[in-house]
Amino acid sequence: MTNIRKTHPLMKIVNSSFIDLPAPSNISSWWNFGSLLGICLIMQILTGLFLAMHYTSDTMTAFSSVTHICRDVNYGWLIRYLHANGASMFFICLFLHVGRGLYYGSYMYLETWNIGVLLLFAVMATAFMGYVLPWGQMSFWGATVITNLLSAIPYIGTNLVEWIWGGFSVDKATLTRFFAFHFILPFIVAALAGVHLLFLHETGSNNPSGLNSDTDKIPFHPYYTIKDILGALIMISMLSSLVLFSPDMXGDPDNXXXXNPLNTPPHIKPEWYFLFAXAILRSIPNKLGGVLALVLSILILMIIPLLHTAKQRSMMFRPMSQCMFWILVADLLTLTWIGGQPVEYPFVVIGXLASVIYFLIILFIMPITSMIENQLLKW
């Protein structure tokens, strides 16, 4: 008799995705981040659900409701800090996952890649709106500054901003709708992640060599289930250390004081995972130009498959491209650092240079490097 996991309508979906799935025998730990992102998402939804049970989305009570969660709710402090720092872990895993895709040419799976970019946008939107909810100083002013960017859109800009605000400033209506969107978006992310996996399983996983691995496949279970559990344990231990030893490390001290529309903080900056985007945004002195650069800095990922000029898929055997890739990583770290610095000399100059280098490497230097390597293959 055939095993029930292969016949039952629901269980056979699980079976073909997580148990009998044929996987390449040589995928490294860089392939762990998909499952880690899934764990992050589940954890964020669960902790978020318990936070929503005690949170009030009203300007008068939002800040004190978060205080109440931390002081009076059983293990509320733990849930709150798991949720806040869980977002940081989420983005660490996201950036490493995208970096892996860039390095090993996983972007050649077009549907999987494009849905991945869409997922990145959705998670960024969710994180931004979640940051506003505690209604601290930086929450309020972050929301004001970022929503205000939409006013740069010609003709409809101002109306659009007031429509999003639900008034003439960030206020009660804005907070309520942000809470509603922040609650619904993670479920949309979960659905998109399902489609992401669906398209991935049409082609099967890529592998470090970038070569076809159909001749050498192993079952996902037990090999990669145990590997994923190890990865999860490492991530959970890192998150636990962060939450239990320095929960406020990644937060902004301004958020320890409640929002005050009459008092602007000297340096408005987002959470660390948006600093690179903030640096690109303010590297252009024009408002609309900055907004376009900001959107394009992520949207550029969509055209990366078109810029692939190399004869090999992966960078494993392409030392020159590897060099450019790590320069790009260093450039993004530079942008992240600049995003957290005040707007003054020399940071403005460094930021603008790093922004130009970012787009130059992706649009021109990488494709040209690949073409040079193609010529070197003939030698």
Curated annotation (Swiss-Prot):
What the entry lists under Pfam families is as follows: Cytochrom_B_C (PF00032), Cytochrome_B (PF00033)
What family is this?
Belongs to the cytochrome b family.
Record's keyword terms, sorted = Electron transport, Heme, Iron, Membrane, Metal-binding, Mitochondrion, Mitochondrion inner membrane, Respiratory chain, Transmembrane, Transmembrane helix, Transport, Ubiquinone
Give the encoding gene's name: MT-CYB
Give the protein's recorded name.
Cytochrome b
Query: At the top level of its lineage, which domain of life is listed?
Result: Eukaryota
According to the record's subunit comment, the protein's assembly and interactions are: The cytochrome bc1 complex contains 11 subunits: 3 respiratory subunits (MT-CYB, CYC1 and UQCRFS1), 2 core proteins (UQCRC1 and UQCRC2) and 6 low-molecular weight proteins (UQCRH/QCR6, UQCRB/QCR7, UQCRQ/QCR8, UQCR10/QCR9, UQCR11/QCR10 and a cleavage product of UQCRFS1). This cytochrome bc1 complex then forms a dimer.
Identify one Gene Ontology CC term for this UniProt entry: respiratory chain complex III
- Share an example GO biological-process annotation for this protein: mitochondrial electron transport, ubiquinol to cytochrome c
Task: Output the Gene Ontology terms for molecular function.
Answer: metal ion binding; ubiquinol-cytochrome-c reductase activity
Task: List, alphabetically, the SUPFAM superfamilies matched.
Answer: a domain/subunit of cytochrome bc1 complex (Ubiquinol-cytochrome c reductase) (SSF81648), Transmembrane di-heme cytochromes (SSF81342)
Task: Give the cofactor note.
Answer: Binds 2 heme b groups non-covalently.
What residues bind a ubiquinone, as annotated? Answer: 201
Q: Function, please?
A: Component of the ubiquinol-cytochrome c reductase complex (complex III or cytochrome b-c1 complex) that is part of the mitochondrial respiratory chain. The b-c1 complex mediates electron transfer from ubiquinol to cytochrome c. Contributes to the generation of a proton gradient across the mitochondrial membrane that is then used for ATP synthesis.
Q: Which residues bind heme b b566?
A: 97, 196
Which source organism? Answer: Crocidura suaveolens gueldenstaedtii (Gueldenstaedt's shrew)
**Annotated positions binding heme b b562:** 83, 182
What start and end residues bound the annotated signal peptide?
none
